[in-house]
């Protein structure tokens, strides 16, 4: 799934300029990384807000079109208003096809209703993590990681080390020796 989003380069920077943009229905942002200079950009608020609602937007490589030039990026940070459905600021990081990146990818839990813990013991499965940071090349970045709960028994946990990942993808926390629990019955 390739998502394309349109942006315009902006000259005005700072909190006053950003406030003026937000009042005009425009979201300030920045794109940086891959050895290039940071570029201040802006987006139409409604277009960006509805793009953020898509499932794979936060964990996919996106095509960012800035005044006609396309760059491959992924979302590094999104700042939302405290109580309004309003995007305050967004950061994108450029990606190089040959450089390993670290990105947060959500879990998709499957087969929980047929696990022995639920069917035989009447347990409720608790999801301890909703996402994890993975290391991979940009081309290998998954939109979501499936966690199969069909073999989960009462009193047991599913750990990061037991989750099957696509080729070329690894959990960043396992590199540092932290085998976190993902779900427990």
Curated annotation (Swiss-Prot):
A single Gene Ontology CC annotation of this entry is:
cytosolic large ribosomal subunit
Q: Which UniProt keywords apply?
A: Ribonucleoprotein, Ribosomal protein, RNA-binding, rRNA-binding
Superkingdom to which the source organism belongs: Bacteria
One GO BP: translation
A molecular function annotated in GO for this UniProt entry is:
5S rRNA binding
Keyword Acetylation appears in the UniProt entry:
no
**InterPro entries, from UniProt?**
Rbsml_bL25/Gln-tRNA_synth_N (IPR020056), Ribosomal_bL25/Gln-tRNA_synth (IPR011035), Ribosomal_bL25_b-dom (IPR020057), Ribosomal_bL25_C (IPR037121), Ribosomal_bL25_long (IPR001021), Ribosomal_bL25_short (IPR020055), Ribosomal_L25_dom (IPR029751), Ribosomal_uL5_bac-type (IPR020930)
Which CDD domains does UniProt cross-reference here? Ribosomal_L25_TL5_CTC
Could you tell me what this protein does?
Answer: This is one of the proteins that binds to the 5S RNA in the ribosome where it forms part of the central protuberance.
Q: How does it assemble?
A: Part of the 50S ribosomal subunit; part of the 5S rRNA/L5/L18/L25 subcomplex. Contacts the 5S rRNA. Binds to the 5S rRNA independently of L5 and L18.
Similarity-based family:
Belongs to the bacterial ribosomal protein bL25 family. CTC subfamily.
Q: Supply the name of the protein.
A: Large ribosomal subunit protein bL25
Native source species: Laribacter hongkongensis (strain HLHK9)
